[in-house]
Curated annotation (Swiss-Prot):
This is Ribosomal RNA small subunit methyltransferase F. PANTHER family: 28S RRNA (CYTOSINE(4447)-C(5))-METHYLTRANSFERASE-RELATED, NOP2 YEAST -RELATED NOL1/NOP2/FMU SUN DOMAIN-CONTAINING. It is an enzyme of class 2 (transferase). The keyword Methyltransferase applies. It comes from the Bacteria. The gene is rsmF.
C-alpha cells in the first residue's frame, strides 16, 4: 500500500502546476508502472525485434521520446530479466521516463554528422542511459561512464558488456573531480544526478514514507557541486543535460538556476518543448521538462538542457599527470597477426582505425579518441579486452565476440517458427547469417549454451558439418552469444563462468 509522508503532500501541493490536479497525482502514484523496454540497436533493429517478439505474445506501444523505446504488454507471465533476448543484450529493461535525458542530449546539432565524439556520463550506474547513449553514438567516439559507488561499478560494467558497448571507459570517482581533472574536455555531458527519488514512488511504494525537506536541501547542495563540475568539464559550445527522477524544484529548476547565476555569461537554457510530440505538456517556462506521473503515465522525472556559450575559468590548477599507465600501443605487426587470427577463426574484423593496446599478454581495443585522456586520471576499465597471447597464437575473449559479432544478419520478419527445438539451420530467423565461422543456435541450444553446457552436434539433425573446426562463434537471433570449440561430436562451451546462468526462462 502506498505510503506518503503528509509533509510531502503539503510541500508538493505548493509546486504542482495549476493545470494539474493533486487528486490525479495521488491516483497516478498509486498505479503500477507500465512495463517498458529499450531495444539495443547495437545488436538488433527495433523492427526486427518487434517482428521477433510479436509471435511470442508481446505487443508494443512506442515511447514518444525514444525511437527504440516501447511500453510492452505480454500475453503470459515472463521474467524479462531471465529471458534469452535480455541476457544476450537485445534489449534493456528501462523505465520510459529515463530514456528522456539521452534523447535530449542527442538532438539538433548534437545528433547530426557532428555528433559528440567525447561524452561524459557523470553518474552512470546501473547503465541504462550509458548504453542508450552508446547506441545513439553507434559505438563511435568515446563515452566515459563514471560511478561513485564501487558495488554499482560492477553492475555498470556487466551491463556495458552485455549490450555490446565498445566505445566506453569506466571511472570510479566522486563526480565533483571532473571539473578539475577533465577541464573543458567533453563535447557533451549528462548529469543524471543522485536525488531524492520522489518520482520513483510507482515502483517503490515506500519512496515517500520517510520524506523530509531537510534531506532535499542537503542533496541539493551536492547537486549544485556536481552541476558546476559538469559544466567545467564541458567544452565551449557543448551541451549539458541535467536530469533527476525527483519532483521538488529545489533539486531541479533551482539547480539549473544556480548554474546560471554562477556563470551568467556562459549558460544558455535550450527549450525542450519540441523534443517530441506532446513535450509541451510537461514544459516549464524555462524550457525544462518537469514530468509529473499523470502527464504521460510514467515515472516522475526532470530534464533540462543547457549550452555552454563561452569558456569559463578553471577553479584549480592542472592536476599532475597520472604515471604508470599500464598499456602501450600494440606494434603494427602484432595487430596484423591478431587481425588474421580473428578473421580466420571467426570471420570478423577489427573496426577501421582500431586503437589496439597491449597490457602484459593481453590485447585491448580502445575507443579511438581515448589517447587524449591517457594520464589525465585513473580508469577502471577501457574499451574491450580482445584476446590473450598464448605460446602459439591467441585466445579471443568473450566480450570481443559480443561486440564484434553484434549483427551477423537476421531475418526476423520471416520468423514464423517459434518452436524452441526447431533446428537453427532451418529456422528462417537465421537464414541470412552468412558468416562461415558462426553456428546459429535455436532456443533450446542457446539455453544450453548460456547454462554453461556443451552442445551435442546430434541436436542439429544432420544439418551441421561434423568435421572438427576448432574455435567458432555461436549466435542466436543473428547476434553472437559466445565461443565454442567445434570438436565434431560436440561444441565445447567457452562461456566465462561468471556469465553462466543456472536457470533460464
Amino acid at each position: 500500500m502506498l505510503q506518503i509522508n503528509p509533509n510531502f503532500i503539503k510541500h508538493i501541493e505548493q509546486e504542482l502546476p495549476s493545470h494539474l490536479s493533486m487528486d490525479e497525482f495521488i491516483l497516478a502514484c498509486n498505479r503500477p508502472l507500465r512495463q517498458s523496454i529499450r531495444v539495443n540497436t547495437l545488436r538488433i533493429s527495433s523492427e526486427d525485434f518487434i517482428a521477433l517478439m510479436t509471435p511470442r505474445g508481446w505487443s508494443f506501444s512506442p515511447v514518444p521520446w525514444c525511437s527504440d523505446g516501447f511500453w510492452i504488454t505480454l500475453t503470459h507471465d515472463e521474467q524479462l530479466g531471465n529471458c534469452l533476448e535480455h541476457i544476450q543484450g537485445l534489449f534493456y529493461i528501462q523505465e520510459a521516463s529515463s530514456m528522456l535525458p539521452p534523447t535530449a542530449l542527442f538532438t539538433n546539432d548534437d545528433a547530426d554528422e557532428r555528433a559528440p565524439l567525447r561524452v561524459l556520463d557523470m553518474a552512470s550506474a546501473p547503465g541504462s542511459k550509458t548504453t542508450q547513449m552508446a547506441a545513439l553514438m553507434n559505438n563511435n567516439g568515446l563515452l566515459i561512464a563514471n560511478e561513485y559507488s564501487a558495488s554499482r561499478v560492477k553492475v555498470l560494467h556487466a551491463n556495458v558488456l552485455r549490450m555490446g558497448v565498445s566505445n566506453c571507459a569506466l571511472t570510479h570517482f566522486d563526480g565533483r573531480v571532473f571539473g578539475e581533472y577533465q577541464y573543458e574536455a567533453f563535447d557533451a555531458v549528462l548529469l543524471d544526478a543522485p536525488c531524492g527519488g520522489e518520482g520513483t514512488v510507482r515502483k517503490d511504494q515506500n519512496a515517500l514514507k520517510e520524506w523530509q525537506l531537510d534531506d532535499v536541501i542537503a542533496i541539493a547542495d551536492t547537486q549544485k557541486d556536481l552541476i558546476e563540475a559538469a559544466f567545467l568539464a564541458l567544452k565551449p559550445g557543448g551541451a549539458l543535460v541535467y536530469s533527476t527522477c525527483t519532483l521538488s524544484q529545489l533539486e531541479n529548476q533551482a539547480i539549473c538556476q544556480h548554474l546560471l547565476s554562477r556563470y551568467p555569461e556562459a549558460v544558455a537554457f535550450e527549450s525542450l518543448a519540441t523534443l517530441f510530440d506532446g513535450a509541451a505538456k510537461a514544459c516549464t517556462e524555462e524550457g525544462f521538462l518537469h514530468v509529473w506521473p499523470q502527464i504521460y503515465d510514467s515515472e516522475g522525472f526532470f530534464v533540462a538542457k543547457m549550452r555552454k556559450t563561452a569558456s569559463v575559468p578553471r577553479i584549480k590548477s592542472q592536476p599532475k599527470a597520472q604515471k604508470n599507465f599500464p598499456f602501450s600501443p600494440a606494434p603494427e605487426k602484432q595487430i596484423a597477426a591478431l587481425q588474421d587470427y580473428i578473421q580466420q577463426s571467426f570471420a570478423l574484423s577489427l573496426p577501421p582505425g582500431a586503437q589496439v593496446y597491449l597490457r602484459d599478454d593481453e590485447f585491448w581495443l580502445f575507443p579511438a579518441p581515448f589517447s587524449d585522456f591517457i594520464g589525465t586520471m585513473r580508469f577502471q576499465r577501457i574499451g574491450i579486452k580482445l584476446a590473450d597471447v598464448l605460446k602459439k597464437g591467441f585466445k579471443i575473449k568473450h566480450e570481443a565476440v559480443i561486440a564484434l559479432g553484434a549483427k551477423l544478419g537476421t531475418n526476423a520478419n520471416n520468423n514464423s517458427n517459434t518452436n524452441p527445438n526447431n533446428n537453427a539451420n532451418t529456422n528462417p530467423n537465421n537464414n541470412s547469417n552468412t558468416n562461415p565461422r558462426c553456428i546459429p543456435l535455436n532456443q533450446a541450444q542457446a539455453e544450453q549454451f548460456l547454462m554453461g553446457r556443451d552442445i551435442d552436434t546430434a541436436s542439429f539433425d544432420g544439418k551441421l558439418d561434423l568435421t572438427p573446426k576448432g574455435e567458432m562463434m555461436v549466435s542466436y537471433h543473428g547476434a553472437a552469444i559466445g565461443v565454442v570449440k567445434h570438436l565434431g561430436h560436440r561444441l565445447k562451451n567457452s562461456l566465462p563462468r561468471e556469465l553462466v546462468r543456472d536457470n533460464l526462462g
